[in-house]
Amino acid sequence: MARRENGVQASEDKQGLGKSRQAGLCADTIIMTMDGELPARDIAPGDRIITRDAGMAVLLGVRRKRLRCDAIQIKAGSLGHKRPPEDVILPAGTQILIRDWRARALYASAQKLVPVQDLQDGEFVTLLPAQDLDIVEFIFDTPHVIYAGGLEIGCQTND
């Protein structure tokens, strides 16, 4: 069953990859903030993050952890013109906003938040072997879509 967050339809994991459910961003992922582009590792509560849905949101909290999880690699330019601008690695459960032919073809929707693992095609969006990643999760008062690594990434609340 799908749910709606800030007017964007979000999907639920149907693949049940277990440890793949981990979401977040790798610590070196570049985030768009009101102070410019910063790596996720340098962002702290109180920072103002640029969002697709609200323009700007104040970050309430940050979770940092190192763990072993499945990861997805998205090759540069594979999700649109310069989207992402360079190869990006994300934990497999990270929600990504798609709003192109993929959303229409796969979900009959103009835009949709989906776990990045659901976009695997074996060539441009590929599953990497489980690996140790430094993960950063952002916590907001309401769900938001942020700009991270040249992609639009869904961030949740502290539920």
Where are these regions (language model features)?
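A sequence-level detector of short linear motifs
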Residues: 39-40, 58
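Long beta-strand-rich cores associated with HINT superfamily self-processing modules
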Residues: 26-33, 50-56, 60-159
